[in-house]
């Protein structure tokens, strides 16, 4: 989240995607089954991203390119992705999701609550997603199936001008999850949420993780975004079980990591 930054070459607190790439490489060497995702606010916020969005349109955005080169599994769009307008965002998405090459891999995109505005509104839902992006993916690791759902921030309509999110209907987060909940439970042993949201509600209703976890009992892990805080928060679900929420910081200063150990015989896990 928020990978790019303005940084001095002096000092010892270096950040950036080269260090993240090294860490990811180490994790993949140690663990066979790794899922790598990003929770948004990736292509806006610095002179570098502005330059490639507006001045160097014929060259791939470096933030998108590095995700492809690092073989990311999923990207969830953040609210700042819409600041440059839909044309620029769509260009970035088209590149990110283009077919793999010898040096780059296609990256999946998921925002289950971003729906096609042509067929979804406040009164009607057919749950067709914007751009037909998958509402979630199922990954199988040594016989264990994991559902990973991306959820975008629904408050973008209050932050950006309408032309910047033209064609999207923003559905409620809890409503969206519960629409797919039974389907994911039937298909997967574990359910993970990657979302561009903070944890606790605010007056703008842009942070909804506590509401989501505390009103359900099927989510096993959440990766947050939006607040750009760093740390782990545990939230009790409706069964009283504490679910970890990992907040992965900002500007590639830290990497949020969860390690699942799953017992197929008892269908239980530690994280």
Stretches with model-predicted labels:
Residues 1-271:
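Acidic, metal/ion-coordinating pockets
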């Amino acid at each position: 989240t928020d990978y790019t930054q303005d940084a001095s070459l002096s000092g010892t607190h270096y950040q950036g995607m080269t260090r993240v790439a090294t860490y990811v490489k180490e994790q993949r060497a140690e663990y066979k089954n790794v899922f790598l995702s990003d929770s948004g606010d990736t292509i806006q916020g610095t002179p570098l991203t502005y330059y490639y969005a507006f001045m160097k349109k014929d060259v791939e955005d470096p933030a998108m390119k590095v995700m492809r080169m690092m073989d990311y599994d999923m990207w969830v769009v953040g609210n700042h992705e819409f600041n440059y307008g839909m044309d620029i965002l769509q260009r970035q998405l088209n590149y990110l999701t283009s077919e793999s090459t010898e040096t780059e891999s296609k990256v999946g995109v998921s925002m289950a609550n971003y729906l096609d505005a042509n067929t979804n509104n406040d009164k009607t839902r057919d749950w067709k997603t914007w751009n037909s992006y998958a509402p979630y993916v199922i990954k199988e690791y040594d016989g264990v199936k994991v559902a990973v759902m991306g959820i975008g921030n629904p408050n973008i309509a209050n932050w950006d001008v309408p032309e910047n999110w033209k064609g999207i209907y923003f559905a409620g987060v809890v409503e969206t999850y519960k629409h797919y909940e039974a389907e994911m439970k039937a298909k997967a042993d574990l359910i993970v949420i990657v979302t561009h949201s903070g944890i606790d509600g605010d007056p703008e209703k842009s942070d909804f993780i506590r509401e989501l976890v505390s009103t359900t009992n099927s989510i096993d892990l959440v990766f947050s975004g939006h607040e750009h805080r760093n740390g782990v928060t545990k939230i009790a679900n409706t069964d009283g079980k504490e679910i970890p929420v990992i907040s992965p910081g900002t500007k590639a200063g830290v990497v949020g990591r969860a390690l699942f150990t799953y017992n197929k015989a008892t269908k239980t896990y530690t994280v």
